[in-house]
Amino acid sequence: MKSRETLIRLKKFQVDEKRRRVAQIEGMIADFQRMSVDLEREIQTEQERAGINDPSHFAYPTYAKAAIQRRENLTRSADELRIQLEDAKSLLGEAFDELKKVELLDERDQARERAEENAREQADLDSIGLMRARLGVA
């Protein structure tokens, strides 16, 4: 029984770790998206300041070109993180399923132990009743 409790605690810990990993990846994606939006605003501001909106124009601001590159890198990184997020969610689901299996086994064992205990108690009560009946005690 003790090993089953330890196993349940281990599975709960694993589920918590997977949840933290999912939350961490989601946070990183949100940060990248926020930074990308900030860069887009900076690009727009720089384009308005220079009066040039075409990145291929020879006088296009260097800062805007660099910001576009950073924004693209952030977008690419966020896309890669989304793939990792799907994998992490899948692992979380598997860990949760494993936890549920162990918990169900534990519940089944506890129910069986309760039934055995009830059967022993009933047998004891039956033997007491039988002895009283043999002795003629009412």
Where are the language model's segments positioned?
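Charge-rich amphipathic alpha-helical interaction elements
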Residues: 1-138
